[in-house]
Amino acid sequence: MFGRTLFPARVIALGSGLFRTPLRTLAAGPALSIGGIYPPIATPFTDKEEVDYGKLHENLQNYSSFPFRGFVVQGSNGEYAYLTREERLEVVRRVRQAVPKEKLIMAGSGCESTQATIEMTVEMAQSGADAVLVVTPSYYRGKMTSSALVHHYTKVADHSPVPVVLYSVPANTGLDLPVDAVVTLSQHPNIIGLKDSGGDITRIGLIIHKTKHLGFQVLSGSAGFLLAGYSVGAVGGVCALANVLGAQVCELERLCLNGRWQEAKELQYRLIEPNTAVTRKFGIPGLKQAMEWFGFNGGKCRSPLLPLTEQEIKELRHIFTVNGWLSL
């Protein structure tokens, strides 16, 4: 199905200095390893709701002490849906300039139409992205069948100068990328992985089982099921909570990779509630509030997102406190 690509027998230079060819074979495995922990970084705004690049740079400097594999830029937690095209690209450029070359930059390039996604993908690569994270188009989700999604992602991957990572986030899109579509797309030589934020470990394990012979890589989309993801063969995680508890999320990764499952389980327990609080319960306003408590620049969200109420702030702080991450 994917015998011809846009870049046959050609080596592509990536922003990080890595190189890959899209002629992936069954035995070769992934040409770009994406295993590890990534915070999907928040976008700081000024009081006038303009992107605050100074505070963004400060956050990146503060994250430099953590053993992250890289950064997801302009993902859901970056409020990409509220940024202009130029803002999305400029944030990627600034992040690429601010972090070491060995840190992988995975940029969210998803748009609603295939053509717009292709254009954004090419521009993200030109702005310094090493790979792109492409969310499912969902405005017309009733028509987003497996066939439509396979067609969409195939065209994007055919035209992308960097590797493509699929992104399924049903809580935001109302659409779960079907397993059969993922399995089909895993055969495309320029589609190297999936970020699955749905939290269905049975589904994640099935995808890994059906695609591992291709070197396809699956990332858990939340710290809440990071241990479970590693237990079925995920290679890492894109975790909102890593914006707040970066060292602890990386420690959970280390424990899992070293087979220290009992210690990993105890740490995982203490991350579940805070993770839920900064994702499903309080969302990006909660994430940004928690970042402030831990010395990072969270700040305001862009409208129409509202800040937490005083009661919500108290509830959020209580959750971090009872799990041992903050004092009263």
UniProtKB/Swiss-Prot annotation:
Coiled coil: none annotated. GO terms for cellular component: mitochondrion. InterPro entries: Aldolase_TIM, DapA-like, Schiff_base-form_aldolases_AS. Homotetramer. It is an enzyme of class 4 (lyase). Residues 1-26 form a transit peptide. CDD domains: DHDPS-like. Catalyzes the final step in the metabolic pathway of hydroxyproline. The record marks 167 as: Involved in proton transfer during cleavage. It comes from the Eukaryota. Inhibited by divalent cations. Its main location: mitochondrion. Keywords: Lyase, Mitochondrion, Schiff base, Transit peptide. This is 4-hydroxy-2-oxoglutarate aldolase, mitochondrial. GO terms for molecular function: (4S)-4-hydroxy-2-oxoglutarate aldolase activity; (R,S)-4-hydroxy-2-oxoglutarate aldolase activity. It comes from Xenopus tropicalis. It is found in: Mitochondrion. Its EC number is 4.1.3.16. The keyword Lyase applies. Belongs to the DapA family. Pfam families: DHDPS. The active site is at 195 (schiff-base intermediate with substrate). It catalyses: (4S)-4-hydroxy-2-oxoglutarate = glyoxylate + pyruvate; (4R)-4-hydroxy-2-oxoglutarate = glyoxylate + pyruvate. GO terms for biological process: small molecule metabolic process. Substrate binds at residues 76-77, 197, 221.
